[in-house]
């Protein structure tokens, strides 16, 4: 039985290799970069993508510092595993479901960008015309990664690790991707109704919030009455990483090094500082 379990990772790796050969992401005939690509915008979005990814480890520290000592590692691992699992799903089919050819404005065609097909030399995304399509895809990936990780705070210390992995897979494919398509795709149902989600207020935070509420109601409250955070230093470190990463999250949503990105960065800085100071005042009272 153990030998069969040990073969599973190798079989999965073999399947990915075979699929990569059958559906190569790189075109057989090299082509020049699409017209309209701006180097400054590309450089900024590369930076923004890295900043947003930092938020997930920051979230791991933030939640890990709040739980009891015996559950610190498992709670932090829930955020970290999201980076691995969601990335694989996104590369295989997630980006296609979110941004592929629209099916009645609800979901994307899973075959449009299956295994990142034709992404390297593909036409830039309509709403981000100055950066490569592959960069847009991987910037959006960072949003998809942190969204299920946000939910973990609602059921911390009350879910099995294997159940959590299944949960984030189902959430990504059946909640996040359809909502992202409906909201951010030019042919999306909500987009056509004029819904404006600049930096994930609907796609990321509302979906995570409702899922967190449903999870908390279903799993009930913790058994322990008294609870003390395991590591306040982890909470502070996580807060700092989240604050830092949020500049890429919000300012990066302008998809370019422009005035809109500057405004988003300034607003993020001011709002974060005001919120932190207000919290300190109320906590002191």
Model-derived segments and spans:
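Hydrophobic alpha-helical transmembrane bundles of multi-pass membrane proteins
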Residues: 1-285
């Amino acid at each position: 039985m153990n030998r069969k379990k040990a073969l599973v990772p190798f079989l999965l790796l073999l399947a990915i290799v075979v699929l990569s050969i059958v559906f190569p992401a790189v075109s057989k005939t090299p082509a020049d970069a699409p017209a309209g690509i701006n180097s400054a915008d590309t450089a900024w979005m590369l930076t923004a993508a890295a900043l947003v990814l930092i938020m997930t480890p920051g979230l791991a520290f933030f939640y890990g510092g709040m739980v009891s000592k015996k559950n610190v590692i498992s709670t932090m691992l829930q955020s970290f595993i999201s980076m691995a699992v969601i990335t694989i799903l996104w590369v295989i089919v997630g980006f296609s479901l979110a941004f592929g050819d629209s099916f009645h404005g609800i979901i994307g065609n899973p075959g449009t960008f299956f295994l990142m097909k034709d992404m390297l030399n593909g036409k830039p995304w309509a709403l981000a015309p100055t950066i490569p399509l592959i960069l847009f895809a991987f910037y959006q990936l960072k949003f998809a990664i942190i969204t299920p990780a946000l939910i973990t705070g609602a059921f911390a210390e009350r879910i099995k690790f294997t159940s959590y992995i299944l949960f984030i897979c189902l959430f990504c494919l059946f909640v996040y991707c359809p909502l992202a398509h409906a909201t951010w795709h030019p042919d999306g149902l909500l987009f056509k109704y004029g819904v404006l989600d600049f930096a994930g207020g609907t796609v990321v935070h509302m979906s995570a919030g409702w899922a967190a509420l449903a999870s908390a109601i279903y799993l009930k409250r913790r058994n322990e009455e008294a609870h003390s955070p395991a590591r306040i230093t982890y909470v502070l470190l996580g807060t700092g990483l989240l604050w830092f990463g949020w500049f890429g999250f919000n300012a990066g949503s302008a998809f370019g090094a422009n005035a809109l990105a500057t405004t988003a960065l300034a607003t993020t800085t001011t709002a974060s500082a005001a919120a932190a100071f207000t919290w300190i005042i109320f906590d002191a009272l």
